[in-house]
């Protein structure tokens, strides 16, 4: 089974409530933090923005995980969403768009630095860490859920990495986990941005358990009461059935194993038989994406196969630092904010015009320095013995 860092799949009454943090004057942070007996409870609570993640939200998440790691009161952490159908829509594009319009590239870089640093902190956090996802989870939302000890999906779960559609690339650890998915499925998801449900996510080991959302409260109660979480989750887990990608796996493996994006598109265009309609639709979808981002994602996942998570995050910070200064990033974010009917105008507009040397330069260290990650153990983790003795 494909596992994330640390071997996990990709994915006395002590009460204290910490709410009302302020992100800006008059604007709530968008996350509620609560300590309910032995559980740290995180609720994404920014429904008007579909739980889009801001720099302040990443900082607050990191602060609380660092606070809870050594706490003798906390057995584990559970994360949930207040929105009925969205867990998180990813990064806060409205704020990123405003910064891009202002030329505030330093602020954008710090946003991505905070996001990638939080992913690394989660990799080092060994207490039970259980996101409960029963809705759409995109981009940055995947980054705050995939690297825990467990990842629980309900029937409403949908996951997608749509970043190439905004002139960016599949980040937040995508270099690491997408490159390790079976049968070139990671590249397929990266280039198309298509969403998958719980059945495909379970087969690809992007979630650890499929549990009907009606039982999520049982999981929260168990963490609060210090009950062993693995046995409980295994008992609640249900067979999610066969996913949409299962039948397509041979075609994905055959087509997306080609040596360039252009060759992939040629194979999709030439496909016939039972997969012809899927292939034509997939090719059309890919051609709506930023040509530069398509090339970046292809090269990124090729490199990611041999990288550790830490090195993958460092590579992503390099890419982010360079891409935010390019026209496609501002154009892509702007078109997404504008909504349907506003098609992005990519520069260059077609794959044939993308300069391969410029793609290679995007992987070079940024002028503001590399992403610094502490790879020592112990700062945000405790031993299994401590977990059983507290």
Where does each model-flagged region fall?
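Amphipathic alpha-helical blocks and their helix-capping loop/short-beta junctions
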Residues: 206, 211-289
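Hydrophobic, secondary-structure "cap" segments at the distal end of domains
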Residues: 175-184
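Conserved CoA-thioester-binding segment of acyl-CoA-metabolizing enzymes
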Residues: 7-8, 16-80, 120, 380-390
């Amino acid at each position: 089974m494909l596992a994330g860092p640390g071997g996990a799949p990709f994915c006395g009454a002590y009460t204290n409530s910490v709410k009302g943090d302020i992100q800006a004057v008059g604007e709530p942070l968008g996350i509620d933090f609560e300590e309910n007996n032995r559980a740290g409870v995180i609720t994404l609570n920014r429904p008007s923005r579909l739980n889009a993640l801001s720099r302040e939200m990443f900082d607050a998440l990191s602060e609380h995980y660092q606070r809870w790691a050594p706490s003798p009161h906390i057995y584990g952490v559970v994360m949930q969403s207040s929105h009925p159908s969205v867990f998180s829509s990813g990064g806060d594009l409205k704020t990123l768009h405003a910064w891009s319009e202002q030329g505030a590239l330093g602020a954008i870089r710090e946003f991505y630095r905070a996001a990638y640093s939080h992913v690394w902190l989660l990799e080092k956090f060994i207490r039970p860490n259980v996101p409960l996802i029963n809705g759409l989870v995109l981009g940055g939302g995947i980054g705050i859920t995939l690297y825990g000890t467990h990842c629980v999906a309900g029937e409403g779960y949908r996951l997608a990495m749509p970043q190439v559609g905004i002139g960016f690339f599949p980040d937040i650890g995508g270099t690491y986990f997408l490159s390790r998915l079976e049968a070139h499925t990671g590249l397929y998801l990266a280039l198309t941005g298509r969403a998958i449900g719980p059945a495909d996510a379970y087969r690809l080991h992007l979630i650890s358990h499929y549990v009907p959302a009606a039982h999520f409260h049982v999981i929260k109660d168990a963490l609060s009461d210090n009950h062993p979480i693995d046995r409980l989750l295994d008992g609640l887990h249900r067979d999610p059935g066969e996913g949409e990608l299962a039948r397509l796996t041979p075609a994905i493996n055959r087509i997306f194993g080609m040596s360039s994006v252009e060759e992939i598109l040629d194979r999709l265009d030439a496909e016939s038989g039972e997969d012809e309609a899927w292939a034509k639709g997939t090719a059309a979808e890919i051609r709506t994406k930023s040509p530069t981002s398509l090339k970046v994602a292809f090269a990124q996942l090729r490199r990611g196969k041999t990288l550790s998570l830490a090195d993958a995050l460092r590579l992503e910070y390099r890419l982010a630092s360079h891409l935010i200064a390019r026209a496609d990033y501002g154009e892509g974010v702007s078109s997404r904010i504008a909504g349907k009917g506003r098609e992005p105008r990519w520069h260059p507009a077609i794959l044939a015009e993308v300069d391969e040397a410029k793609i290679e330069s995007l992987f070079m260290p940024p002028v503001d320095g590399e992403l610094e990650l502490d790879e020592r153990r112990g700062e945000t983790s405790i031993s299994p013995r401590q977990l059983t003795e507290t």
